């Protein structure tokens, strides 16, 4: 454990979606603003795509943190690879409507619509976030997504559907025209720039308790060159670099340490 060596209170580069470590890069903030717009203005559906490790999941956690808990009921699904009835049952459970066994599909739809109407009657919005949505390969389940967006009153959608996924999700949605037409907000996350990487690393270190970054400027440039600005890869490389420097009792992480750590990760 290298925490004491680097004067840290927490591990700074864990690849878990802890919203406390969310870094407001320009691309993530634009995505977040688009999602907030979709929720606040009742746009029905929004889709955020990006490569593996670009920060989609932590973005969803940041969104949940920024939505007023008194105004919005948020359900999050991380395993959408389900057949239609199991999918609807999972949606109901995500909205805290539990069943020991999945009831018939028609009953699920009636109960879901009833839950959404009750939320609206209390002045609450309903938000369904589906992570790893590119995993939905059953066309029947995609049809259920479209049907969710048919749940409307005369002037608004009963819920906001947010799809997060890898780039394949864009092609998946393209092949389902009725669903594609209902997605009002779309955005693709970009990689972090060199400047962002510098700020990202410093941000995570500060959240973890550091007063000063142990990475040299050349080390940060090497981190960017190796990872191409992909947050998950940055986390892995920084963590390994801090560990390597600690094991060698080095007080400063330089380019040589980063290069060696990157080779260990390949």
Name every feature range the model reports, one short phrase each.
Residues 1-42, 259, 263:
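A short, basic N-terminal segment
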Residues 3, 83-86, 99-130, 134-144, ...:
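Mid-core helix/loop region of P-loop NTP-binding domains shared across ATPases and GTPases
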Residues 8-13, 71-72, 82-101:
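Conserved NTP-binding/hydrolysis module of P-loop NTPases
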Residues 41-63:
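Walker A/P-loop nucleotide-binding motif
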Residues 46, 69-80:
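Conserved catalytic segments around the Walker B and adjacent sensor/switch elements
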Residues 63-67, 167-184:
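Short regulatory helix/loop adjacent to the ATP-binding pocket of P-loop NTPases
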Residues 83-90, 175-206:
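Conserved AAA+ ATPase core "coupling" helix
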Residues 101, 122, 127, 158, ...:
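C-terminal alpha-helical "lid" subdomain
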């Amino acid at each position: 454990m290298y925490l004491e060596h680097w004067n840290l209170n927490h591990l700074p580069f864990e690849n878990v979606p802890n919203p406390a470590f969310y870094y407001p890069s320009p691309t993530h903030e634009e995505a977040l603003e688009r999602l907030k717009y979709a929720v606040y203005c009742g746009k029905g559906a929004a889709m955020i795509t990006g490569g593996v490790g670009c920060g989609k999941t932590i973005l969803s956690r940041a969104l949940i943190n920024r939505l007023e808990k008194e105004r919005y009921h948020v359900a999050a699904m991380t395993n959408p690879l389900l057949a239609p009835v199991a999918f609807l049952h999972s949606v109901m459970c995500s909205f805290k409507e539990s069943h020991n066994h999945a009831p018939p599909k028609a009953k699920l739809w009636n109960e879901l619509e009833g839950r959404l109407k009750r939320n609206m009657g209390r002045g609450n919005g309903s938000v369904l976030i589906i992570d790893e949505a590119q995993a939905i390969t059953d066309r029947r389940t995609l049809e259920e997504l479209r049907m969710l967006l048919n749940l409307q009153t005369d002037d608004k959608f009963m819920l906001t559907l947010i799809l997060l996924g890898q780039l394949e999700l864009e092609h998946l949605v393209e092949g389902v025209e009725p669903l594609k037409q209902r997605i009002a907000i779309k955005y693709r996350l970009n990689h972090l720039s060199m400047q962002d990487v510098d700020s990202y690393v410093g941000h995570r270190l500060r959240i973890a308790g550091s007063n000063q970054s142990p990475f040299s400027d050349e080390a940060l440039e090497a981190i960017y060159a190796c990872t191409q600005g992909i947050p998950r890869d940055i986390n892995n490389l920084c963590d390994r670099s801090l560990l390597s420097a600690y094991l060698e009792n080095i007080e400063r992480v330089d380019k040589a340490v980063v290069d060696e750590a990157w080779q260990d990760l390949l």
